Structure formats: C-alpha cells, structure tokens
Amino acid sequence: VPPASPSAGAGLLRSAAQPDAGAIARHIFVDAEERPIPGVTNGRDYVIYAFLPESYEAHPERRYPVVYVCDGYWDGPLIRTIYGNLLYDKTAPEFILIGFGYPGEHADYGKLRRWDYTPAVDAVPDGGAPDTGHAAEFLDVIEQTIIPRVERAYRADPSYRVLAGSSFGGLFTLYALFAKPGLFQAYVAASPSVGFANDWLFHDEAEFARSAAARAVHARVFVSGADHERPASFGAIQRFNAQMRAHATPGIQYQYRIVDGEHHAGTKGESYSRGLRFAFAPLVSPEKK
C-alpha cells in the first residue's frame, strides 16, 4: 500500500493548534502537542498527546471524531502512521488522535500503566504492596477531566469517540465498555490481557451482559489475539471471544481476529488498522468501504 502524503489529500495528522500555549509542555513527538493534565480526581498527574487532522485549520466549521489511545507514548505514533494509510484507502474519516501518557523524563511507563489500566488487584509476590487495580479511578479521570478538556480545546465531535489499547491497554479498553457503556461508541482491543487476575474481566462481561445497560448500549467492539502469544494469554483471549459470542449482546457489533504468525506486541499494527476500519465503518460512505 503506498503511504499517504499531503498530495494525496488531507492524509496526515499535523501538530495540534495551540489554543492554550502557556500550558503546553515540550513536544516529545515532532508533530504532537503534549498537554499536561495535573491535579485530577485521583491525585495523579497525566499528559495527553494531541494530533490533529491536516484539514483542521482550513475547515473551522468541521468537528472530528476522536480516537483515545492508551500508552500514547508508544501507540500514538503507531496509530498516527496507520492513519495516513486509512485515509489513502478511504476506510476511515479524518479524526483527532489523543494519546494518554505520563509526565517526566524518566517515567516508569510499565509501572504506571499497570496501576492505571488494571481493574483488579492481582496477587503480589513476596507480600509486596499491590501495584494494580485502579482502572475505575483512571476511567473517572478520562470521563471527568480528559474528555471535557479535549472537547473544550479542540473541535471534537462528542457523538463519536473511540477507545483503543493493546495488552493492559486492551484490557482497560474492554473494562471501559462494561464499566461505563456509552462513554465511547467504539472499542479496539489489541491482544488484551483478559486473563489478568484470574479472569476478572470475564465476570465484568457476564454481569454487563445481564444488565439493563447491555440492552441499551450501541457500540462496535474489535478484539484481536496472536496465534504465537504465550499459550495462557492466547487461551484467555480465545475463551473471552467465545463468551462474547455466546452472550451476543444485541447492541454490540463485534469482530474478532487472530493475527497469524505474530507474537503479543506484533499484533498492534494489523489490529489497529483493522480495528479502526471496523470502528469507523458507520462514518464511511458505502462506496468508500
């Protein structure tokens, strides 16, 4: 597939406009704005990385759907690259991309994401302090602080939000569907760690499927796994897929894909490409699909 270029249309995400320049910190990506999110409801500081469509300044009348991605410091640049290909193929609309991140030159991303993206306390070896189980608090931060700030600062369309993530980020993405259905309209979970804490998410999904919220939800959900994952991880994803299909929540349009020949992290590229195409299918005219 040839890469998208500015000459191919509004294909590339550009650096975000600066409506609040005094609050903007250093740029860690060439074409992204890093905006601090301090003093939030859980007492922890965050940053967001904002990438805007190239047409953003030229069309002030337009509003854009938003993709929020976990691990923005890793997966933001990846989705930004995939974005150009999606636009070239006309399989997604222009969208704003917001990556979740953490401040500091030496932030321990592994530790921080484990704290924020997991919905339950997992067993801790040697009796150490738990470092998991704060997904509910982080989801509150997203709902009460990050989304409102994004929708004030940018011309974001509040009617179509997508949440995406991989591994623990994929676990969090699915947790968000069951915990706050309706906050997002589509979910992309690449190789999600659904076996975490003795299949905790399976119980969340089962409770959700029995709830009144499940009868009212309208969402598109994409899940992937890799056939070269660790057997326990791939087995958990397969079992989760079977449970989702068995419950068949009417308002959820669900797609599952096994990425052939890949390991855990290697699912990201194909998963985000296919997942975003699936997420945005309702916004793409039939002749462009």
Where are the regions a protein language model picked out?
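Non-catalytic cap/lid and distal C-terminal segments of serine-dependent acyl enzymes
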Residues: 5-289
